[in-house]
Amino acid sequence: MKKVLLITTILLLSFSIQAQDNKAKDLLNKVTSIVKGYDNIVIDFKYSLNNAKENIHQDSKGNVTMKGNQYVLNFMGVTKIYDGKKNYTIVPEDEEVTISSVNEKDDSAITPSKMLTFFNSGYKCSMDKLEDIKGRKIQYVKLVPTNAKDQRKEILLGIDVQTKHIYNLIETGKKGTKTTLTVNSFKTNQPLSKNQFTFVASKYPNYYINKLD
């Protein structure tokens, strides 16, 4: 009798976990579908890095404009422009521009556009906590890397229940470092200049141009 009860309990628990995993996958699929439906996306964000053991605490703000695979990212005093073929990294402090090619087929290459859909592969996902943040219902999905060599322990992805937009991303490393990216503003289908993703060299007359390829 005890064995029957134990087996029944294990089966019920397995079904419950499977159902939670399926709910998480369905939610992530909805997020991906909605993001891909926009012509362009403009995001203002806050980035925090903390490691209590190493006494590290850093806060930064940034913004990114995306259209397809093109983007302009402003973060930590550096501007990165990707026009679909070349990557331009502009560093005013050093008066330098680095130009390089990007292999779009390289899955390991992290780009702003991939940050909104990175969770589609390489992770085991499950539903986590539901929080009320400033009147918004934020559903968290826990992502655990399937690669044992990954230095990240887990990622909590906060999703606005109503809009299905990503609210924040909390990444915990195996060595205790926690990084949090919080979306302060998420705008879509904005009027953009036709030269929004074009690098104009004449704007940087005294800069050193470093062409890597």
Where are the regions that the model predicts?
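Beta-turn initiation residues at beta-strand->coil junctions
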Residues: 47, 91-92, 170-173
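N-terminal leader/targeting segments and the immediate start of mature chains
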Residues: 11, 15-56, 69, 208-213
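One face of beta-strands
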Residues: 41-47, 60-64, 71-73, 153
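An acidic-aromatic
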Residues: 61-109, 179-180
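Positively charged n-region of N-terminal signal peptides that target proteins for export
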Residues: 1-4, 20
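Gly/Pro-enriched, hydrophobic low-complexity segments
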Residues: 126-204, 209-212
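Surface-exposed, polar helix/loop patches in the mature regions of secreted/periplasmic/lumenal proteins
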Residues: 86-144
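Sec-dependent signal peptide hydrophobic core
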Residues: 5-9
